[in-house]
Every structure is written in structure tokens, then in C-alpha cells.
Amino acid sequence: MSFTVIIPARYQSTRLPGKPLADICGKPMIQWVYEQASKAGADRVIIATDDSRIEAVVKGFGGDVCMTSPNHESGTERLAEVIEKCGISADEIVVNVQGDEPLIPPSIIQQVAQNLSDSVAPMATLAVTIDEEDDVFNPNAVKVVTDAEGYALYFSRASIPWDRDAFAQGETLTANPLLRHIGIYAYRAGFINTYINWQPSVLEKIECLEQLRVLWYGEKIHVAVAKEAPAAGVDTPEDLEKVRAILSK
């Protein structure tokens, strides 16, 4: 199986400016992400950025970097530009790994690529079972439900499926655990151009979940439970300190 990993990295961040270049035990965060992705067996790992500072750092540690427009409205549009600039063929599998996940397990990058290769869907992603009560009703923990074949029926910030009887009795962790979506995607490269030419859907605007556009237009997304539960990404200075503590051991 052949696949390419693309890691979008933007300098601007509301809660942590310059996040991709934040030092973690002597290396910038984006280098940690790049090195984890490079262990997944991909043919190529590309960092996509619109910032010359990130470009210089990536070149400095020997990484593959593609400069993109600063005017994209979504990360998916940025992927489409990289695919065109780098000559990635339409049937190639592309895995999108977030640039703020220095602890991402290489195994799940490979898993989502393999799942797409084995499925009839043009897109695949992963989930983990919810075992923390706080996540059940947390709108920032996106839930997903699938059909019998593992294809997504819906993604929501609400608690789906709603366990009427269990919740009525005050229970929060149910006998059939809810699934929390994690933000790693695999696509057929050609599908990304199809996707960005669709108009945003009503549902994605309501939920603020871009992946709902795929279901709205009748395409499939394969979902599997991740082999390893990834650690949380870095969104705040507090998250950064936690990651530094883990990687310093």
C-alpha cells in the first residue's frame, strides 16, 4: 500500500501563537509530528505551510515542505493545493495529520490509510470509545455513529446515540460506549478536489463539522476504532507543558 502524509502547519493560533515552532525538549513541535508520521510507512511526508518561518525550520531539519496560499478557508483546500503542486495522483491515498499532535502514534496513521485502501469509501477516519464521563456531554468531544459495515451515519457534538433509558436513570457511561471521533483522515487524492467544489451543507454549518459535507452529498466515510488512543493535541500553553513533561522522561 502506497500513501502520502500531509501535515498542515499554520503559525497563527489564537491560544498559542507560533505553535508549530514551540520548543519541546530541544526540537520544534512540528519536527516531532514529522518524525512520528515518518515512522508510519508512508512513501512521503509533506508539511504544508503558508509561513516562511515554518518553511525555514522544516528545511533545517531535513523535512519536506510545500508552501501554500494564506487565503484558504479550510484545511481541505490547503490539501488540494499540495496535491496539485506535488503531482500526487488521483488514486493515491493521502493521510491528513494535524500539526499539533507530537504524540500521535504511527500505528494509527498506517491504520487509517489501510482502512481506506480496504474500503469502498473515498474517505476514512478513526474513533475511540468514550470512557470519561465528562466527554459524554462535552460538545468539544465529537461523537460518531456508524452502520453495521463501519460507515458513518452521522457526526455530532450532541450525545449520539441518545441512550434514553440509561440517561433517564442518571447514568452517563452506558453499556454500549459512545464513540468519540479523532481528527485524522485518509482520502483518495482525487476526492479532495470533488469535496472542495461542493457547497457547504446546512448540517456542517449547524454543527461546525466540515466532514458532514461528505455525508450530505451521499458519499461514505469509513470509521474504525483506533488501535491506540492518541494523546490530546496541543491547543494551549498548559497542553504544551504536559507534552514537554511526557517527552522529557
UniProtKB/Swiss-Prot annotation:
Pathway: Nucleotide-sugar biosynthesis; CMP-3-deoxy-D-manno-octulosonate biosynthesis; CMP-3-deoxy-D-manno-octulosonate from 3-deoxy-D-manno-octulosonate and CTP: step 1/1; Bacterial outer membrane biogenesis; lipopolysaccharide biosynthesis. SUPFAM superfamilies: Nucleotide-diphospho-sugar transferases (SSF53448). It is an enzyme of class 2 (transferase). Its EC number is 2.7.7.38. It is found in: Cytoplasm. GO terms for biological process: CMP-keto-3-deoxy-D-manno-octulosonic acid biosynthetic process; lipopolysaccharide biosynthetic process. It comes from the Bacteria. It catalyses: 3-deoxy-alpha-D-manno-oct-2-ulosonate + CTP = CMP-3-deoxy-beta-D-manno-octulosonate + diphosphate. Keywords: Cytoplasm, Lipopolysaccharide biosynthesis, Nucleotidyltransferase, Transferase. GO terms for molecular function: 3-deoxy-manno-octulosonate cytidylyltransferase activity. Activates KDO (a required 8-carbon sugar) for incorporation into bacterial lipopolysaccharide in Gram-negative bacteria. This is 3-deoxy-manno-octulosonate cytidylyltransferase. It comes from Aliivibrio fischeri (strain ATCC 700601 / ES114) (Vibrio fischeri).
